[in-house]
């Protein structure tokens, strides 16, 4: 095998995000449910005989050491592999949005090069490499909607069908937010009550209508801080509210999202009306599995 083309790197939404504490090393402990959506970057991979790692930006220019490049080098360092790769990356997912675009690129790179280079690493082995790149990477490697805890490395997949199919409006304001600025803010409360997986399983996520608005599982503890630092987060929520949609922030922002009722007149971006200049609005569906699910074995 010499090449793999058109591999997706999907975004995620945080249905809720609770900060329950902080480790001695400064990392925050979270509880959240991550849900995959069908808004994706696209990556291409070709073997290089000279052993070099390179990247071609097929869209907007990216930093020289973006997460796809870092993932390729981390995989080689962990395995001793000397093979090379050329990565083509078509970037659609906005940065500083809280939807995991860079982490998803890293996960797709790990899964793809594990196959392209014939390494045969398991999911758990790839997750251990992934967490060194970013807290969200193991989730994308695992490739299933999941409850996520710890600093992001404790992943409990949800039962198949627990999250019903739904449609979401995702709004990314022009302004972005640095994750570090959110977590270092003195405004951040770090003592949320713990949310159990059994409690989430009992929540109302299976009825018709706006089934993703259970009161106990739609809070993002980072949102008040983000709104204080970035007024456009509030503006985006108000933009959704003006259209009858209940918005909330995903991740560390600045993107917000809302479920769209299953109605024929609210299924396309154009139906939501014009957004302010520089904003991105995307109508997405949730995914039950990552498109590359099954690309690595579950066990060593």
Swiss-Prot record:
Task: Using the UniProt record, name the top-level EC class of this enzyme in a single word.
Answer: transferase
Mention one GO molecular function. 4-(cytidine 5'-diphospho)-2-C-methyl-D-erythritol kinase activity
E.C. number(s) listed in UniProt: 2.7.1.148
Its Gene Ontology biological processes? isopentenyl diphosphate biosynthetic process, methylerythritol 4-phosphate pathway; terpenoid biosynthetic process
Q: Where is the active site?
A: 12, 136
- Purpose of the protein: Catalyzes the phosphorylation of the position 2 hydroxy group of 4-diphosphocytidyl-2C-methyl-D-erythritol.
The entry's family comment says: Belongs to the GHMP kinase family. IspE subfamily.
The protein depicted here goes by the name 4-diphosphocytidyl-2-C-methyl-D-erythritol kinase
């Amino acid at each position: 095998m010499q090449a793999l083309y058109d591999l997706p790197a999907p975004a995620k939404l945080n249905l809720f995000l609770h900060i329950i504490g902080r480790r001695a090393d400064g990392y925050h402990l979270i509880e959240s449910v991550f849900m995959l959506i069908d808004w994706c970057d696209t990556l291409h991979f070709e073997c290089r005989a000279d052993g070099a790692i390179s990247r071609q930006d097929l869209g907007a220019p990216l930093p020289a050491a973006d997460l796809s490049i870092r993932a390729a080098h981390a995989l080689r360092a962990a395995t001793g592999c000397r093979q090379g790769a050329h990565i083509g990356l078509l970037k659609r997912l906005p940065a500083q949005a809280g939807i995991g675009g860079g982490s998803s690129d890293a996960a797709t790179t790990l899964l793809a090069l594990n196959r392209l280079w014939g390494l045969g690493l398991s999911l758990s082995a790839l997750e251990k490499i992934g967490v060194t790149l970013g807290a969200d990477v193991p989730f994308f490697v695992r490739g299933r909607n999941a409850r996520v805890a710890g600093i992001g490395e404790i992943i409990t997949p949800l039962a198949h069908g627990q999250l019903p199919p739904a449609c979401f409006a995702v709004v990314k304001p022009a302004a972005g937010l640095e994750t570090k600025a959110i977590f270092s803010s003195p405004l951040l409360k770090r003592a949320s009550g713990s949310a159990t997986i059994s409690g989430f399983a009992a929540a109302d996520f299976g009825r018709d209508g706006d089934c993703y608005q259970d009161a106990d599982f739609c809070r993002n503890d980072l949102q008040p801080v983000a709104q204080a630092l970035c007024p456009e987060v509030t503006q985006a929520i108000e933009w959704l509210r003006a259209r009858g949609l209940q918005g909330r922030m995903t991740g560390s922002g600045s993107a917000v999202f809302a479920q769209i009722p299953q109605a024929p007149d609210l299924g396309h971006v154009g139906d939501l009306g014009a957004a302010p200049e520089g904003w991105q609005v995307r109508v997405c569906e949730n995914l039950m599995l990552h498109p590359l699910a099954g690309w690595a074995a579950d066990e060593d």
